[in-house]
Amino acid sequence: LKSARVAESPTGRKFFEVVFEKNGATLTQTEWKPDNKNGQLSDEDIQRKEDNQFSRTMQLLLCFYKDEELVFNGTNFEEFAKEVVDYLNKADKSKLLRVKIVYNDKGYTTLPSYAKYTFIEPMILPEGQTSAITELRIDNFTKPVVADVETPVVNPGPSESISISPTVEAAVENNAENPYGLPF
């Protein structure tokens, strides 16, 4: 764990960000405020997103704190995010973590979006305990190939308005200096 902060995007969306670092390489995990995209989601869907986000965040916090040490008094995302960031910035950053990092559908590295399975834990586990992090079928460890999006070419107009004049280039001959007759 390197740092954590609360911020707002240029478009006004609220989020908190957690940065992990190992040997100079960083992973930035952004947790966005769950919102109702143009009224497309039900109240239950929003609540499910909030619960999932809370569970994922608790997995991270429990690497540094005992459950009874974590008290949240916030009533909205902004207050929750501030409390999470405060806890993370006060955490012992020398404590090593074992983190499962996967690719999302756009080819970026991220933490898994699920909360049901373990994806982060302390590197040093209590005596007799083994790692709960496992490779799941839903995990993507191979960077997906994302094809370029082709944009259609706009037709300049009716075909009769385009005049095409064939050009004739000087013929290239096969000779000792150019045995294949190539123009280069």
Where on the chain are the PLM-derived regions?
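Short beta-rich binding modules
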Residues: K2-F184
